[in-house]
Every structure is written in structure tokens, then in C-alpha cells.
Amino acid sequence: GRERVKNDKNTFGEIIYRPVDRRQNFVKRAVGLPGETLKIVNDTIYIDGKPVAFPENVQFNYIAAMNGPLTDDIIKRLEITASDVETMSLNEFDRANLATWIPGAKDATHFYALPLTAKMITELTDAGMLKGYIKTNTLLPPGTQGSYLFPDGLADSWSLSNYGGDNGILIPAKGMTIKLDRDSWLTYQRAIRNYEGHTDSYFKDGHVYIDGKPADTYTFAMDYYFMMGDNRDFSQDSRFWGFVPEDHVVGTP
């Protein structure tokens, strides 16, 4: 495990730590602030139980049924990244099956998987091109995404669109004290060990140990944030990483 890597330098070499200010930067939206409880229900973010309006440029990935091709000019005008547009080749059976999910798909001539904003959907509909559409995530079997999401071990039944379980997820704040048990350890262990420096901390035999000693509570030393990208279905963000500590926030675009 980690201790062997640290102690067996002949096999694994010296451990090189990567300073915070030399890590790759990501541009994400801080959707949850320190001390807030976040939950996602059918793509809508709830903060402390209240829904948050979608940003104007938020995108979701759709399967879109069109009555004509998406030309390079249309893609450029809509400001869609061309590499994000996937042309779907469907046989007659696949098309009939998709028509059960997308009204109008039976009469469509072209099918695409692509990210769209609400404004893009309106423009394509008003232009008479868009016959119908459906969010790609709704076609995935339940549990498909959960094993990849944070926190590992608690999110198996969650998805990108429905995240946080029944009670949501509490974002740590400086000075906030939590009760330590299995679930809270799974949620906050990365913050405690990796960001706040308590590397000799673990869960064993039903108890949490901080710095090698049994502990019932933990008080955070830093503020944390929950970050999400506006391309909601294709964003690597806090739904995968977990909380972002204050010293990892380097600025605003």
C-alpha cells in the first residue's frame, strides 16, 4: 500500500510532490460554497434545499433527430465544438427503437449526439431542423455512472443528473466540525488526508483514526468548494474529484 511505496525507496524511488501552484488549471463554476449542502435532482442543482437557475450557457448532451445535415456553417454559427458532434449511423431497427423515445425521430433523416444549450435547441427548432431530442444520460441503465463518482463507496446509485442521495452532500467550511463514522469518512477522507495533511488517518474496525488516534469528530482547517463545468455531461469536476480546497482556487477567468 501507500506505506510500502513511501518506505521502499529501492523499488519505488523518491516520492516527488507536485506543488499546488504547478498543477494544471481547470476553469469551473463554483456551484457550492463552504458550509452549503448540495444536491442535484434531474439536472437542477439545489443549494440548502433551494433550486438554482441554470446558467445561460449550460449544456447537456443530447441525441438529436434532424431533418437535414448539420453543416460546418451551422455548427460554427451555433458555436458548437466540432469535435463534440458525433454523427450516428442507424439502421431501420435502431431508428424505430429511437422513435419510441424521441417523437418525430421516425421522419428524421440525420441523427447526432452533441452538446446543446437551451438557446441552441430553440434556434434549431425555429429553423425547422430539429425533429426531436432526448438527453443521452436518460438512456443509460441505472447505476451506470455511480461507480465513477465521488465519494467512492457512497455514490453507486447516483448519477451526473441525480447526485447527492436523499440528504445531499455537505461542503466543508473552515471551523466546521463533523461527526466521524463510515459514511463521513468516505466523504471527507480526501480532504482530511490529502489537503489538511493528516496522512496517518484511516477507518478500521468501525472507527476513524486521525493521526493514528481514535477520533469521534473532526474540525476542518480550510474552506472548500464544489465545482462544476457548464458542459454538464462532459465535465470532469467535483462530481468526480470531490471538494476543492481554498488553496487550489487560483483565480477567476
Region locations from a protein language model:
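Soluble "head" domains of membrane/secretory-pathway proteins
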Residues: 1-253
